[in-house]
């Protein structure tokens, strides 16, 4: 069997629990080890914080009150108790507020905080020391005049400061600080009352700072803000130290249930900061009250909701939307929360005059109605384009029909006029050829009439001489006339077939073209 090595047990105490006595004992050594940077020290001297200034002012006020009280009353002071459990007992040393030390912070943060507070604490102790010396001198002069002097005066005279100071200006903590029983360090009941009032004021300020986030952003109605403003304007006596944001006198006091009607739920506004509301009280109060009274009806209709009356069948949804939008914009313009862009976008009919909005109470329940302008319907661009396109289409149809009928007429004319197979005539050439054909027909008719007359004369004579006369007539006549006469004699009627006539016209046409070219 192999022997297992026993591992040593290590106990680690990771809990860091510094106690108050340890830190109090090391505070003097920490101040010696840490050197305050000169730049940081000068910055603290030149730019004190607002809290330090307020604390110094409170200390000066308390010291002045204490000096006045000591001059007026010369009484026997009660001895100082050996221990000071309360923070009010430290007021005799000029320290009205104790520093809250976080004892659960690490060591490096303890060093940094002690170094930062060293400069301020030294300044406070110097001021307190100077004031305390003046108090001791006044007390010594008063006590020398009295016959009986307590034993504590001798100790105070021997040590005018009443306590020892170290090299850094810090008061050294020792048992003598608590055992000294001088008349100057004793507390009167009036002084304790003043200190208690200051502590209560500080507690109220802390509570107000915690509740300010919730109070400032509570949604309230316009009526509630107006009621709070009237209450704020009432004469009240408050001390100068009380904060204006006191929770006991809040600007957002809610009204009773009887005053919160249904029509008020439509007019929610988020309240601004109390400072801005206080500045606008005198300007907005009368306008808001007058505008709200204009929307309320008489005594018999207190519970009547004018906004819900629009839900009836008398008004349409668009009317309700327009009226609600006009009322909301009017409320925002009176309350000072309207935007310039919204006012510019609104039409003058929606805004109206101030008198028309504020004098709406005379209407006794008649809601604000936007007048509708019924204009003539203008044709849209699409309708105009459609009409134009229809007209264009009809014109094109008529043009095609006209062209088609003209082409049909020329085709019929070309069929009547004798043409050659090689002819590719245009419309103008077709018309010219038609005129020439008409001229040819006129000549044929005139020559045929003469030949017919001669033929009739020859028929009355015997056949042989008639035949001889006919042969001489044919020889005398040219080609077309001779053929025409022969045809007429053969048929016995003056009718020429179209084929023969076209052939004759073709021959005549070619002869005319040849003569024209020669010329």
Swiss-Prot record:
Gene Ontology CC annotations of this record: nucleus
A Pfam family annotated for this UniProt entry: HLH
Limits of the bHLH domain: 390-441
Compositionally biased residues, Low complexity: 54-76, 134-146
An example molecular function term from Gene Ontology annotations: DNA-binding transcription factor activity, RNA polymerase II-specific
Superkingdom of the organism of origin: Eukaryota
Cited Gene3D superfamilies: Helix-loop-helix DNA-binding domain
Region (Disordered) residue spans: 53-77, 131-156, 301-321, 368-389
Ranges annotated as biased composition (Basic residues): 368-379
UniProt KW keywords: Developmental protein, Differentiation, DNA-binding, Nucleus, Transcription, Transcription regulation
Residue ranges the record marks as coiled coil: none
Listed SMART domains: HLH (SM00353)
Assembly with partners or alone: Efficient DNA binding requires dimerization with another bHLH protein. Homodimer.
Name of the protein described by the UniProt record: Protein twist
Source organism: Drosophila virilis
Lineage: Eukaryota, Metazoa, Ecdysozoa, Arthropoda, Hexapoda
């Amino acid at each position: 069997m192999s022997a297992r090595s026993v591992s040593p047990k290590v106990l680690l105490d990771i809990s860091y629990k510094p106690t108050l006595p340890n830190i109090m004992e090391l505070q003097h050594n920490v101040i010696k080890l840490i050197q305050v940077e000169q730049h940081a020290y000068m910055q603290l001297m030149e730019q004190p914080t607002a809290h330090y200034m307020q604390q110094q002012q409170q200390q000066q006020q308390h010291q002045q009150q204490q000096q006045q009280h000591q001059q007026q009353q010369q009484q026997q002071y009660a001895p100082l108790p050996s221990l000071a459990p309360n923070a009010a007992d430290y007021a005799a040393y000029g320290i009205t507020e104790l520093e809250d030390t976080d004892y659960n912070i690490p060591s490096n943060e303890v060093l940094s905080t002690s170094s930062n507070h060293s400069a301020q604490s030294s300044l406070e102790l110097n001021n307190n020391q100077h004031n305390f010396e003046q108090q001791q001198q006044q007390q010594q002069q008063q006590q020398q005049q009295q016959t009986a002097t307590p034993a504590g005066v001798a100790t105070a005279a021997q040590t005018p400061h009443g306590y020892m100071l170290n090299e850094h200006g810090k008061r050294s903590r020792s048992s003598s600080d608590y055992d000294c029983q001088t008349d100057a360090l004793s507390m009167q009941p009036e002084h304790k009352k003043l200190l208690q009032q200051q502590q209560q004021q500080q507690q109220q300020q802390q509570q107000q700072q915690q509740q300010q986030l919730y109070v400032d952003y509570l949604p309230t109605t316009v009526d509630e803000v107006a009621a709070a403003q009237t209450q704020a304007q009432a004469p009240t006596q408050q001390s100068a130290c009380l904060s204006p944001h006191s929770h006991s006198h809040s600007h957002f006091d809610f009204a009773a249930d009887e005053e919160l009607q249904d029509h008020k739920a439509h007019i929610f506004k988020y309240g601004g900061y109390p400072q801005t509301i206080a500045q606008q009280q005198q300007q907005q109060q009368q306008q808001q009250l007058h505008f709200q009274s204009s929307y309320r009806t008489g005594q018999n209709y207190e519970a009547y909701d004018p906004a819900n009356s629009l839900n009836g069948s008398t008004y349409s949804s668009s009317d309700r939307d327009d009226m609600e939008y006009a009322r909301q914009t009017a409320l925002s313009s009176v309350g000072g929360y309207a935007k310039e862009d919204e006012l510019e976008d609104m039409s003058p009919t929606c805004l109206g005059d101030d008198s028309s909005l504020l004098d709406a109470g005379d209407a006794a329940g008649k809601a604000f109605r936007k007048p509708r302008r019924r204009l003539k319907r203008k044709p849209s661009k699409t309708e105009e384009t459609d009409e134009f396109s229809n007209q264009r289409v009809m014109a094109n149809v008529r043009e095609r029909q006209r062209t088609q009928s003209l082409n049909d007429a020329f085709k019929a004319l070309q069929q009547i006029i004798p043409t050659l197979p090689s002819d590719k005539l245009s419309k103008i050439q077709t018309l010219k050829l038609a005129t020439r054909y008409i001229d040819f027909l006129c000549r044929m008719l005139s020559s045929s009439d003469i030949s017919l007359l001669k033929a009739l004369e020859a028929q009355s004579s015997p056949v042989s001489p008639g035949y001889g006369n006919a042969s001489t007539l044919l020889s005398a006549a040219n080609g077309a006339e001779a053929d025409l006469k022969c045809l007429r004699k053969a048929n016995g009627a003056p009718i020429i077939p179209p084929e023969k006539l076209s052939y004759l016209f073709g021959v005549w046409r070619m002869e005319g073209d040849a003569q024209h070219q020669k010329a």
